Amino acid sequence: MNQTAINRADVRTRFIFDDMPVRGLHVRLENVWQHIVKQKNYPAAIRRALGELLAAGVLLSGNLKNEGTLIVQVQGRGRLKMLVAEAASDRTVRATARWDETAEIADDESLGDLLGEGGVFVLTLQPKDGEPWQGVVPLEGGGIAQMLVNYMKRSEQLDTHIVLSASDEAAGGLLVQRLPEEVLDEEAWEHVSTLARTLTAEELAGLDAQHVLYRLFHETPPRVFEPETFEFSCTCSRGKVSDMLLMLGGEEVGGVVVEQGSIEVDCDFCHSKYVFDETDVNALFGEDVVGVAKGLPRHTVQ
């Protein structure tokens, strides 16, 4: 089901410095973020990390050159199993998390403590046409922002500074980066990145791009481009669930229907529920897979 929450305040703003080869992006997500956190009862520490990852995904998707979706994931073996955020070229987003809901999680717990040992960062580019590309690296850094800076330094060899923040009201992010194949005086880059470091989490979550950029760079103001509006949209559908069931096979699916009466699949992102009863399953496979699971002779169905 395609669910959409539109908010004019949910924007990404690009900017560039004309007097130095540095570009940047600012993002602030308000209603979109509140729509996401209402889907589940997230512990505060996980909610904060998910908001930061969502803002990061929107920032990084600004570099998409073709139509498609950028997916950023953090995976672990601890109490937090996964964070995932998706940002598409049509400026739609969705995000969710999976964790051990029986575990105690303090409000101030770090991402590293939640993920445990063996955590990885996964970035996937899923083009509309063509083969997907995926990069997987061990988690490095104390939080999502530093993890992404390390990843981009390794993969793109570009100096980058990222600030991320998430509160109950909004998720925000700021990225400044050297332009590729351009020479930049080290002192100039240090000046820009030092100014970016002075931005507080409260300012990032609470201020729009105009106020953030003035607060940081009023002495050397960048050129600011037209804001791009984002919205929540989930790409789940009954057809995609049907494809998943077909991959599982008639024997397994028929067996589940015999045991449970039907198959129910809930979307992690938007909580849409898809129910397949005996008639649905048999029609999907084109034969009486439920009857076969009961020990009856195999036969096709119309």
From Swiss-Prot:
Coiled-coil positions: none
SUPFAM superfamilies cross-referenced by the UniProt entry: Hsp33 domain (SSF64397), HSP33 redox switch-like (SSF118352)
Stretches that traverse the bilayer: none
Disulfide bonds: 234-236, 267-270
Biological processes per GO annotation: protein refolding
Post-translation changes: Under oxidizing conditions two disulfide bonds are formed involving the reactive cysteines. Under reducing conditions zinc is bound to the reactive cysteines and the protein is inactive.
Pfam families: HSP33
Gene Ontology terms: cellular component: cytoplasm
Keywords: Chaperone, Cytoplasm, Disulfide bond, Redox-active center, Zinc
Domain of life according to the entry: Bacteria
Main localization (coarse): cytoplasm
InterPro entries in alphabetical order: Heat_shock_Hsp33 (IPR000397), Heat_shock_Hsp33_C (IPR016154), Heat_shock_Hsp33_N (IPR016153), Hsp33_helix_hairpin_bin_dom_sf (IPR023212)
Protein's cellular compartments: Cytoplasm
GO molecular function, one term: unfolded protein binding
Protein's job: Redox regulated molecular chaperone. Protects both thermally unfolding and oxidatively damaged proteins from irreversible aggregation. Plays an important role in the bacterial defense system toward oxidative stress.
Record family assignment: Belongs to the HSP33 family.
Name of the featured protein: 33 kDa chaperonin
Taxonomic source organism: Neisseria meningitidis serogroup B (strain ATCC BAA-335 / MC58)
